[in-house]
Amino acid sequence: MSDLSHIRNFSIIAHIDHGKSTLADRFIQMCGGLSAREMEAQVLDSMDLERERGITIKAHSVTLHYKALDGKTYQLNFIDTPGHVDFTYEVSRSLAACEGALLVVDAGQGVEAQSVANCYTAIEQGLEVMPVLNKMDLPQADPDRVKDEIEKIIGIDATDAVACSAKSGMGVDEVLERLVHTIPAPVGEIDAPLQALIIDSWFDNYLGVVSLVRVRQGRVKKGDKILVKSTGKVHLVDSVGVFTPKHTQTADLKAGEVGFIIASIKDIHGAPVGDTLTLSSTPEVEMLAGFKKIQPQVYAGLFPVSSDDFEDFRDALQKLTLNDSSLQYMPESSDALGFGFRCGFLGMLHMEIIQERLEREYDLDLITTAPSVIYELELKTGETIVVDNPSKLPDVSSVTDFREPIVTATILVPQEHLGNVITLCIEKRGVQRDMQFLGSQVQVRYDMPMNEVVLDFFDRLKSTSRGYASLDYHFDRYQSANLVKLDVLINGDKVDALALIVHRDNAAYKGRALTEKMKELIPRQMFDVAIQAAIGGQIIARTTVKALRKNVLAKCYGGDVSRKKKLLEKQKAGKKRMKQVGNVEIPQEAFLAVLRLDS
């Protein structure tokens, strides 16, 4: 489609479970993207994990053709985005390729914190935001209250927001009709030199690197030689096309369009996300502003159960980082677990998803250590260092100041659950910044240690508010705190992979809770297993996993007591010898025991 005025690039912003993937299905159905036989629920959530958990993890793109009431046919390039707080970087990448966004809000639940955060990102990037009320067929739908919330909380006019039900299909045609008139057409010169932004890329074993691009200017077709600006390498284009949502090859991609380019790039990092593509004949084309590199918030060690899998594990991580640019990793070795990688994630859900993807897609068996955040330490020498692994902490005597990361958490919660949420925030060492009453909801802002937020705060917030509270958070600053390193000893030996950094006030409680939890998780051996928690040289908690014991006296009927004593002494000596040479198998659950201390 050569006329730019008939192209619309948009994405959907919505909180988890507000129905954006279902709305996407309706769009595809109405525009004839798939036949009735090929249609299935949540067509765009193609990863097994996405279907099982009912969430969108990766951004997906679809090109549809919609015949509007004015008789014109519009090309809609639609990019589906995730709604979970851990995947906000996927959202910002999708928004960079669009001119507008649909803000989909559940007409029963109202505005949630994550939609607010993503909506502000869209407005900052200069996008036209169009509100849509979904789930209007539900008995608890209250459109007037929700319109009021959109205006009060986000600050955009929602008086004429389109009402629809993605599930039943009611009002979806009206959404499409409003969309082509509200969202502006892209700008760009088709005859100018090629300038395309890479929004996403993934590795295909047969095709090499497949890049999803938004063409800003010019055009690209099969047989062109393209130049990747950051690497300076030239590649020959094998094919270009769009997703309808099937892989559909086209003659070319022009300014304003979103589609894929395959150029037999075999090097995994040959076309990084956020890079600019141009033709090799016009290397002077300027680079487009990419995306801000996202910094991991949570670090954890990942180790293969069998050391033979180490090379496969490294290859799998390389392929995954291409598809998920926020994942960072570096080699690490542990006395207890051997060789593995220290990986940086955006949050706990991100960590779980990555581990599951590695285990499923690459057939690996992995052990994960307890997650940790980044701490800042000031040493007596005057230098400042950052530590993301508790086992790498320097000796306490050389540290003058220990600083932990503080996040600003914004929580939206109905008034009746406010008390429970405030209690939870105080328990997590939160300091209240402000509170605003917005209709039936309350917006509270807290400064909280990131360590407390990333571990289990999200789950506990949901359970304490019966699922109604929603959370968004961002890093604010480092702040001095009274922190200590909690070591775990098994039979007198420190296990580096189990070390934690905790607040001194909570250390004794955490130590006791952790040793008790470990006692439940470590299987009984033929000898006693002592589990201790220590700060420095001081043991603050201890439990013992009792030995399994064979009854050696079973064959003695009556007889002399010295005979029984002899058998017991012999058993005791054997156990003692076994304890010296025996090693304790620690299951995966024990490494993550820290996450389940409160449950």
Curated annotation (Swiss-Prot):
GO terms for biological process: positive regulation of translation. GO terms for cellular component: plasma membrane. Pfam families: EFG_C (PF00679), GTP_EFTU (PF00009), GTP_EFTU_D2 (PF03144), LepA_C (PF06421). The keyword Membrane applies. One of its GO terms (molecular function) is ribosome binding. GTP binds at D17, H18, G19, K20, S21, T22, N134, K135, M136, D137. Its EC number is 3.6.5.n1. It comes from the Bacteria. The keyword Kinase does not apply. InterPro entries: EF-4 (IPR006297), EFG_III/V (IPR035647), EFG_V-like (IPR000640), EFTu-like_2 (IPR004161), LepA_C_sf (IPR038363), LepA_CTD (IPR013842), LepA_IV (IPR035654), P-loop_NTPase (IPR027417). Required for accurate and efficient protein synthesis under certain stress conditions. May act as a fidelity factor of the translation reaction, by catalyzing a one-codon backward translocation of tRNAs on improperly translocated ribosomes. Back-translocation proceeds from a post-translocation (POST) complex to a pre-translocation (PRE) complex, thus giving elongation factor G a second chance to translocate the tRNAs correctly. Binds to ribosomes in a GTP-dependent manner. Belongs to the TRAFAC class translation factor GTPase superfamily. Classic translation factor GTPase family. LepA subfamily. This is Elongation factor 4.
